[in-house]
């Protein structure tokens, strides 16, 4: 995941934006940090989904076909 310092900076810039004191340079920095955060989040979420197996109450594997294909293509 993203470093704590970067997440703290995202939050700091967000507060400045709400207060109306965000400069143009800080806006560029905020956009860059947000994109980096979203990329990191998506990467981790994809890994979580790929490693999840869904079992119904009868004990049958009902993991969606698309997830099974992602696993197969990964290896």
From Swiss-Prot:
Subcellular location(s) per record? Cytoplasm
Give me the stretches of Basic residues compositional bias. 65-75
Is Transferase found in the keyword set?
no
Q: What top-level branch of life does the organism fall under?
A: Bacteria
Any one Pfam family here would be: DUF896
Q: Keywords, A to Z?
A: Cytoplasm
What GO terms fall under cellular component here? cytoplasm
Q: Provide the residue span(s) of the region labelled Disordered.
A: 56-75
Family under the similarity heading? Belongs to the UPF0291 family.
Q: What is this protein called?
A: UPF0291 protein LMOf2365_1322
The protein's organism comes out as Listeria monocytogenes serotype 4b (strain F2365)
């Amino acid at each position: 995941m993203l470093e704590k310092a970067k997440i703290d900076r995202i939050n700091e810039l967000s507060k400045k934006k709400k207060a109306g004191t965000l400069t143009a340079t800080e806006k560029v920095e905020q956009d860059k940090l947000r994109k980096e955060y979203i990329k990191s989040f998506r990467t981790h979420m994809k890994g979580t989904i790929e490693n999840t197996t869904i079992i119904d109450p009868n004990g049958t594997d009902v993991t969606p076909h698309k997830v099974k294909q992602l696993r197969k293509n990964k290896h």
